[in-house]
Regions:
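Non-catalytic beta/alpha edge segments that cap or flank active sites
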Residues: 1-175
Protein backbone atom coordinates (compact mmCIF):
# COMPACT_ATOMS: atom_id res chain seq x y z
CA UNK A 1 0.00 0.00 0.00
CA UNK A 2 1.51 3.32 -1.02
CA UNK A 3 2.82 5.45 1.85
CA UNK A 4 4.13 8.87 0.84
CA UNK A 5 7.27 9.08 2.98
CA UNK A 6 7.76 12.74 2.04
CA UNK A 7 4.81 13.57 4.32
CA UNK A 8 5.02 13.74 8.10
CA UNK A 9 3.05 11.20 10.13
CA UNK A 10 0.15 12.74 12.09
CA UNK A 11 -0.84 10.80 15.21
CA UNK A 12 -4.53 10.67 16.11
CA UNK A 13 -6.23 9.95 19.42
CA UNK A 14 -7.79 6.50 19.62
CA UNK A 15 -9.93 4.72 22.21
CA UNK A 16 -10.59 0.98 22.45
CA UNK A 17 -13.93 -0.39 23.63
CA UNK A 18 -14.07 -4.13 24.28
CA UNK A 19 -17.65 -5.38 24.14
CA UNK A 20 -17.96 -8.65 26.01
CA UNK A 21 -19.75 -10.38 28.86
CA UNK A 22 -16.65 -12.45 29.67
CA UNK A 23 -13.55 -10.32 29.01
CA UNK A 24 -11.66 -8.60 31.82
CA UNK A 25 -8.51 -6.47 31.85
CA UNK A 26 -6.59 -9.66 32.55
CA UNK A 27 -7.86 -11.69 29.57
CA UNK A 28 -8.71 -9.04 26.96
CA UNK A 29 -6.19 -10.27 24.39
CA UNK A 30 -7.95 -8.53 21.49
CA UNK A 31 -7.84 -5.18 23.28
CA UNK A 32 -4.17 -5.80 24.12
CA UNK A 33 -3.43 -6.59 20.47
CA UNK A 34 -5.09 -3.40 19.25
CA UNK A 35 -3.44 -1.24 21.92
CA UNK A 36 0.03 -2.50 21.00
CA UNK A 37 -0.54 -1.89 17.30
CA UNK A 38 -2.00 1.58 17.87
CA UNK A 39 0.97 2.64 20.00
CA UNK A 40 3.53 0.99 17.69
CA UNK A 41 2.03 2.93 14.77
CA UNK A 42 2.63 6.20 16.65
CA UNK A 43 -0.94 7.06 17.60
CA UNK A 44 -2.13 8.12 21.06
CA UNK A 45 -4.11 5.60 23.14
CA UNK A 46 -6.54 7.89 24.97
CA UNK A 47 -8.85 5.44 26.69
CA UNK A 48 -9.60 1.75 26.99
CA UNK A 49 -12.75 0.27 28.49
CA UNK A 50 -14.69 -2.99 28.68
CA UNK A 51 -18.49 -2.99 28.55
CA UNK A 52 -21.10 -5.79 28.42
CA UNK A 53 -22.91 -7.00 25.30
CA UNK A 54 -25.90 -4.75 25.90
CA UNK A 55 -27.29 -2.58 23.10
CA UNK A 56 -28.19 0.32 25.43
CA UNK A 57 -24.78 0.29 27.11
CA UNK A 58 -23.04 0.13 23.73
CA UNK A 59 -25.05 3.08 22.39
CA UNK A 60 -24.50 5.13 25.55
CA UNK A 61 -20.76 4.44 25.57
CA UNK A 62 -20.27 5.16 21.87
CA UNK A 63 -22.34 8.35 22.07
CA UNK A 64 -20.42 9.61 25.10
CA UNK A 65 -16.97 8.70 23.81
CA UNK A 66 -17.72 10.10 20.36
CA UNK A 67 -18.50 13.46 21.96
CA UNK A 68 -15.18 13.62 23.83
CA UNK A 69 -13.08 16.25 22.11
CA UNK A 70 -9.82 14.36 22.66
CA UNK A 71 -10.99 11.17 20.87
CA UNK A 72 -10.74 11.05 17.07
CA UNK A 73 -11.50 7.37 16.65
CA UNK A 74 -13.14 4.57 18.63
CA UNK A 75 -12.26 0.98 17.80
CA UNK A 76 -14.51 -1.68 19.26
CA UNK A 77 -13.80 -5.38 19.52
CA UNK A 78 -16.56 -7.91 20.07
CA UNK A 79 -20.28 -8.23 19.59
CA UNK A 80 -20.23 -8.46 15.78
CA UNK A 81 -21.17 -12.12 15.41
CA UNK A 82 -24.54 -13.80 15.00
CA UNK A 83 -25.45 -14.88 18.52
CA UNK A 84 -28.30 -13.29 20.42
CA UNK A 85 -25.91 -11.23 22.57
CA UNK A 86 -23.99 -9.84 19.55
CA UNK A 87 -25.57 -6.41 19.16
CA UNK A 88 -22.72 -4.04 18.30
CA UNK A 89 -23.83 -3.45 14.67
CA UNK A 90 -27.42 -2.78 15.76
CA UNK A 91 -26.26 -0.23 18.34
CA UNK A 92 -24.05 1.55 15.81
CA UNK A 93 -26.76 1.62 13.14
CA UNK A 94 -29.17 3.30 15.56
CA UNK A 95 -26.84 6.19 16.43
CA UNK A 96 -24.58 6.64 13.38
CA UNK A 97 -24.58 9.89 11.44
CA UNK A 98 -23.01 8.17 8.42
CA UNK A 99 -22.15 4.57 7.67
CA UNK A 100 -18.81 3.56 6.15
CA UNK A 101 -20.08 0.51 4.27
CA UNK A 102 -16.80 -0.21 2.52
CA UNK A 103 -15.10 -1.07 5.81
CA UNK A 104 -17.26 -4.12 6.47
CA UNK A 105 -17.03 -5.20 2.85
CA UNK A 106 -13.24 -4.92 2.82
CA UNK A 107 -12.93 -6.58 6.24
CA UNK A 108 -14.89 -9.61 5.01
CA UNK A 109 -12.70 -9.78 1.90
CA UNK A 110 -9.55 -9.76 4.05
CA UNK A 111 -11.11 -12.38 6.34
CA UNK A 112 -12.09 -14.57 3.39
CA UNK A 113 -8.45 -14.71 2.33
CA UNK A 114 -7.56 -16.04 5.81
CA UNK A 115 -10.56 -18.11 6.95
CA UNK A 116 -12.53 -18.83 3.80
CA UNK A 117 -16.30 -18.86 3.83
CA UNK A 118 -16.42 -18.46 7.63
CA UNK A 119 -15.91 -14.74 6.89
CA UNK A 120 -19.61 -14.53 6.05
CA UNK A 121 -20.39 -14.68 9.78
CA UNK A 122 -18.67 -11.35 10.47
CA UNK A 123 -20.78 -8.23 10.81
CA UNK A 124 -17.85 -5.81 11.14
CA UNK A 125 -19.11 -2.26 10.59
CA UNK A 126 -17.84 1.31 10.65
CA UNK A 127 -19.52 4.67 10.93
CA UNK A 128 -19.25 8.28 11.93
CA UNK A 129 -20.89 9.10 15.24
CA UNK A 130 -20.77 12.79 16.19
CA UNK A 131 -17.98 13.26 13.61
CA UNK A 132 -15.85 10.59 15.31
CA UNK A 133 -14.80 7.45 13.49
CA UNK A 134 -16.06 4.15 14.92
CA UNK A 135 -14.66 0.86 13.63
CA UNK A 136 -16.25 -2.32 15.00
CA UNK A 137 -14.12 -5.44 14.78
CA UNK A 138 -14.93 -9.00 15.88
CA UNK A 139 -13.73 -10.15 19.29
CA UNK A 140 -11.12 -12.64 18.11
CA UNK A 141 -7.49 -11.63 18.36
CA UNK A 142 -6.86 -12.79 14.79
CA UNK A 143 -9.67 -10.64 13.44
CA UNK A 144 -8.35 -7.61 15.32
CA UNK A 145 -4.88 -8.21 13.87
CA UNK A 146 -6.32 -8.49 10.37
CA UNK A 147 -8.51 -5.41 10.76
CA UNK A 148 -5.60 -3.29 11.95
CA UNK A 149 -2.81 -4.75 9.80
CA UNK A 150 -4.73 -4.85 6.52
CA UNK A 151 -7.06 -1.84 6.76
CA UNK A 152 -6.88 0.53 9.71
CA UNK A 153 -3.13 1.06 9.92
CA UNK A 154 -3.30 2.47 6.39
CA UNK A 155 -6.55 4.40 6.55
CA UNK A 156 -5.48 6.02 9.84
CA UNK A 157 -2.15 7.17 8.35
CA UNK A 158 -2.23 10.56 6.62
CA UNK A 159 0.66 9.43 4.40
CA UNK A 160 -1.41 6.64 2.80
CA UNK A 161 -2.33 7.48 -0.79
CA UNK A 162 -4.45 8.05 -2.75
CA UNK A 163 -6.69 8.83 0.25
CA UNK A 164 -7.17 8.12 3.94
CA UNK A 165 -9.50 8.94 6.84
CA UNK A 166 -7.08 11.29 8.61
CA UNK A 167 -6.86 13.86 5.82
CA UNK A 168 -10.64 14.38 5.80
CA UNK A 169 -11.03 14.70 9.58
CA UNK A 170 -11.03 18.54 9.48
CA UNK A 171 -13.96 18.43 7.04
CA UNK A 172 -16.23 15.97 8.87
CA UNK A 173 -18.37 18.76 10.38
CA UNK A 174 -18.95 20.62 7.10
CA UNK A 175 -22.54 21.56 6.34
Amino acid sequence: MPIDTSLEFVPINIAIITISDSRTKENDTSGDTLEKRIIDAGHQMIKRTIIPDDVSKIKDTLNAMSKEKDIDCNITTGGTGLTGRDTTPEAVKEIANKHIDGFGELFRQVSFEKIGTSAIQSRAVAALINSTYVFCLPGSTGACKDGWDEILQYQLDIRHKPCNFVEIMPRLNEK
